[in-house]
């Protein structure tokens, strides 16, 4: 009897192991624009991001929305600005320039954010010096980065997830950088490619034709999920050509200003599903957020939206989408 029981247990173990090898999930949390710093001309202002972080500590910013970032497999945000200890290379002719201390990578680490997109218009605020300092700070802090021809591949549970990104201005000049990013990630054997696009018109609640062109090109050349940033407000979600497009996630931790035009934003948790070693599709879990927990003041600490705020943000997403929007949405792989 004991031998028969042992054989049954062994059979169950083999069956369970085989099923586990055939199916799997990878959870990726996606957040929007993050300025971990402040404007250069505000450095001595007593209410800046720098002053608050010195007082509250690195864990302050994400403390109210930390759970999805800390319990997932990978997290991605758009890092708007430079991490550099001095102002060398400052492009004084730009209207807005953002700089934070290189030590602020600890904000990402404590929040559980492993990947950042740097393909945006503020990564260049302090010229070559700022770009080099930012990459060095991210590397020293253990954060992966992608964008501007840099690519990142993260392997989870045997599945390779690829990251890259492109600015709208770059794409309009030439498509080769995006094409080469996607070609590289496909050749590297990525099972899923998440591509960041810094695009669109600031504070527009609707995506435009240029965003559509970029998304279609990215998906046509291998992107599975396209993540939009730059408009600083939420936009819709669509399925195009077998890929998923998040037109704009809005701001998240935004140290660049005290006075926000809008506090509405979105965090999305993408649960990637695999079977027989192949990507099957993604479940998107929508988490509306407000970029400050002390409105109308910006205290650089987002919180999850509830009640009427939640409903309003979901409606804004619906208004810019061609499909029904809900808290959880399944998209089958192409």
Regions found by a protein language model. Give the residues of each.
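Acidic, metal/ion-coordinating pockets
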Residues: 22-334
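Positively charged n-region of N-terminal signal peptides that target proteins for export
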Residues: 1-8
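Bacterial N-terminal signal peptides
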Residues: 9-17
């Amino acid at each position: 009897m004991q031998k028969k029981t042992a054989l049954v247990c062994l059979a169950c173990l083999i069956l369970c192991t085989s099923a586990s090898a055939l199916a799997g999930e990878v959870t990726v949390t996606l957040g929007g624009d993050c300025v971990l710093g402040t404007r250069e001309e505000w450095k001595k202002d007593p209410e800046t991001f720098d002053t608050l972080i010195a007082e509250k500590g690195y864990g302050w910013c994400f403390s109210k929305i930390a759970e999805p970032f800390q319990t997932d497999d990978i997290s991605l945000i758009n890092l708007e600005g430079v991490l550099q200890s001095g102002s060398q290379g400052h492009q004084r002719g730009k209207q807005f320039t953002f700089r934070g201390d290189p030590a602020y990578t600890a904000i990402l680490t404590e929040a559980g954010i492993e990947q950042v997109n740097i393909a945006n218009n503020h990564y260049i605020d302090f010229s070559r010096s700022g770009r080099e300092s930012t990459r060095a700070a991210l590397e020293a802090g253990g954060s992966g980065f992608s964008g501007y021809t840099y690519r990142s591949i993260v392997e989870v549970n045997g599945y390779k997830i690829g990251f890259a990104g492109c600015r709208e201005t770059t794409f309009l000049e030439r498509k080769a950088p995006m094409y080469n990013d996607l070609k590289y990630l496909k050749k590297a054997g990525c099972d899923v490619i998440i591509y960041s696009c810094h695009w669109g018109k600031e504070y527009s609640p609707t995506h435009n034709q240029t965003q559509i062109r970029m998304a279609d090109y990215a998906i046509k050349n291998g992107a599975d999920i396209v993540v939009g940033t730059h408009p600083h407000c939420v936009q819709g979600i669509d399925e195009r050509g077998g890929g998923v497009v998040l037109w704009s996630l809005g701001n998240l931790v935004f140290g660049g200003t005290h006075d926000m035009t809008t506090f509405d934003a979105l965090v999305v948790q993408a649960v990637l599903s695999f079977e027989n070693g192949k990507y099957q599709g993604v479940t998107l879990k929508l988490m509306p957020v407000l970029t400050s927990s002390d409105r109308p003041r910006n205290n650089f600490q987002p919180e999850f939206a509830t009640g009427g705020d939640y409903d309003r943000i979901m409606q804004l997403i619906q208004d810019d989408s061609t499909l029904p929007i809900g808290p959880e949405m399944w998209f089958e792989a192409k």
